[in-house]
Design a protein with these regions (language model features):
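Long, contiguous interaction/recruitment modules in multidomain scaffold/adaptor proteins
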Residues: 2-56, 176-187, 196
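Ser/Thr-rich, Proline-interspersed low-complexity disordered segments
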Residues: 40-71, 79, 83-86, 90, ...
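Residue-level recognition of tetratricopeptide repeat
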Residues: 66, 100, 104-107, 145, ...
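TPR alpha-solenoid repeat register
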Residues: 94, 139, 184, 218-219, ...
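Canonical tetratricopeptide repeat
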Residues: 97, 142, 187, 221-222, ...
């Protein structure tokens, strides 16, 4: 029998190596090594096991925003609500809350433009909500509040009137859609009050209160505002305190309470101390939250001025400037405080920055920063109803410090007073101050004096001749 010697009869021979099979095995090994390395570095995570940083939900951002709001950190609350809207851009309730907080935050801003910018942002937010739900009572009520706040901003009269008309319409529709919308009734009462419709305003705020609205901060705040407009300041204080009890970390409420106590201090000097306590409470809350807000320090300084304590007033005014050395309005406020404290030369530097603007060297000089290490340029503030105080105080300081033949203060004052006359010639309170200072400099209102050439030397320190103490333009309510 023939036997093939190449065939093994007792065992199966191993197959020869397949190069494709070997290559596949190597690829699998390489892939496994890569997976193990990625797992070790945390780049991938095993299935069915929660990731270490879970994905945020809309509700988590809303809760975070509510927490920041209750703590009084309005900017952080706004950021949280904005993040919630990224996930649910059509959530009208979130947009309404965001717009409301933006209105509150506008109360804490120091310049007209900052307030206007924030309110316009609020209007954009609530307009999107209305586009999604045009018949939502909550949305329309909040929109009425935003429009009402814009109507009270420093805008041309025609724009203010248009915003107020829109606000009234939105509030009425909101109430018609839901007669239990207590905030809409409160906002409508505030709008009516601004239109001097006192009886109707009183009726609507009473409806809001009697239906359970006394547990809502805005209802209490607006009731306080109505009493304030009626000049019943003690009742206004009581209701502002009720509002602050509901929302204890909103500093603008404490500032308002302080302003009213300070106003009452002219009749009972012990009220000044109470005013200082509320302003200090607002400042303390800001420090606790890490918020740089000069408003409470300005209010404290103005209170000390009324108490006749010029040094304490100047210290607090300077503290406000340290907090915000970039804000033109802060220079104006500090300048007015210095003027009232009879620090006329110091006020001149500050007010020049606010009214005319100043370069880095001049702003350092105003802040008494020596050597000058900061590059802070201050832009001039436009002449408005709120900044005219800085303009005529600056002109008064120039006139009071003028030394004939030694400076050109009167020429500069004439320019400032002409600007004021062009816009406020029909305001007798402003014109009385302007006229008194013009008389010191012998300024003809119809003619700008030529610039005098100052002499190279000056003998002694000039003694200012103060004109009438600058006052805020009278309004229906005490101002900070």
């Amino acid at each position: 029998m023939y036997i093939d010697e190449r065939k093994n009869l007792f065992r199966n021979p191993r197959g020869s190596s397949n190069p494709y099979f070997v290559m596949a095995i190597l690829l699998v090994v390489v892939a496994l090594v890569a997976v193990v390395r990625a797992f070790a570095q945390g780049e991938i995570w095993p299935p069915f096991i929660p990731t270490p940083t879970p994905t945020r939900t809309v509700n988590s951002f809303v809760i975070e925003g509510d927490t920041h709001f209750e703590a009084g950190s309005l900017d952080k609350a706004i950021q949280s609500y904005q993040q919630a809207l990224v996930l649910e851009p059509n959530n009208s309730h979130i947009r309404a809350n965001l717009a409301t907080i933006m209105v509150y935050s506008s109360y804490t801003m120091t310049t007209d433009q900052e307030r206007l910018d924030r309110l316009n942002q609020a209007l954009e937010v609530i307009d999107l909500a209305k586009a999604d739900e045009p018949n939502n009572s909550e949305v329309l009520g909040v929109r009425a509040n935003v429009l009402s706040s814009l109507a009270n901003s420093n805008l041309p009269e025609a724009e203010q009137k248009e915003y107020r008309i829109q606000a009234e319409s939105e509030a009425l529709i909101a109430i018609q859609l839901d007669n239990n919308n207590l905030l809409a009734k409160a906002y409508y009462a505030e709008i009516l009050m601004d239109q001097f419709k006192y009886e109707q305003a009183n009726d609507y705020i009473s409806q809001a209160r009697e239906a359970g609205g006394e547990s809502l901060m805005d209802v209490c705040r607006i009731q306080a505002y109505i009493y304030e407009m009626f000049r019943d300041y003690n009742l206004a204080i009581d209701w502002y305190i009720k509002a602050s009890d509901i929302a204890p970390n909103l500093t603008f409420l404490y500032n308002r309470i302080g302003v009213l106590y300070r106003y009452l201090g002219q009749f009972d000097e012990s009220r000044y101390e109470t005013a200082l306590e509320y302003f200090a409470k607002a400042a303390g809350l800001n420090n606790q939250l890490g918020i740089d807000d000069p408003i409470p320090y300005m209010a404290i300084a103005n209170t000390y001025i009324r108490m006749g304590e010029a040094m304490a007033a100047s210290r607090n005014a300077y503290r406000a400037l340290e907090i915000n050395p970039y804000n033109s309005d802060t220079y104006g406020q500090v300048g007015v405080i210095y003027y009232r404290a009879r620090n006329y030369e110091g006020s001149l530097q500050m007010l020049r920055c606010a009214v005319m603007g100043c370069d880095a060297e001049q702003s350092c000089l105003a802040r008494e920063e020596d050597p000058c290490e900061t590059d802070i340029v201050i832009s001039p503030l436009p002449l408005t109803n709120t900044t005219v105080l800085y303009y005529y105080t600056y002109g008064s300081a120039l006139a009071g410090l003028h030394r004939p033949g030694l400076d050109d203060n009167c020429a500069e004052a004439a320019v400032v007073f002409r600007m004021i006359r062009e816009k406020f010639s029909d305001n007798p309170d402003v014109m009385s101050i302007v006229t008194a200072s013009e008389n010191i400099c012998n300024i003809n209102p119809n003619e700008v004096l030529p610039t005098e050439t100052p002499l190279p030397t000056q003998v002694g320190t000039p003694t200012p001749i103060p004109t009438e103490t600058p006052m805020f333009i009278p309004t229906l309510t005490p101002t900070p």
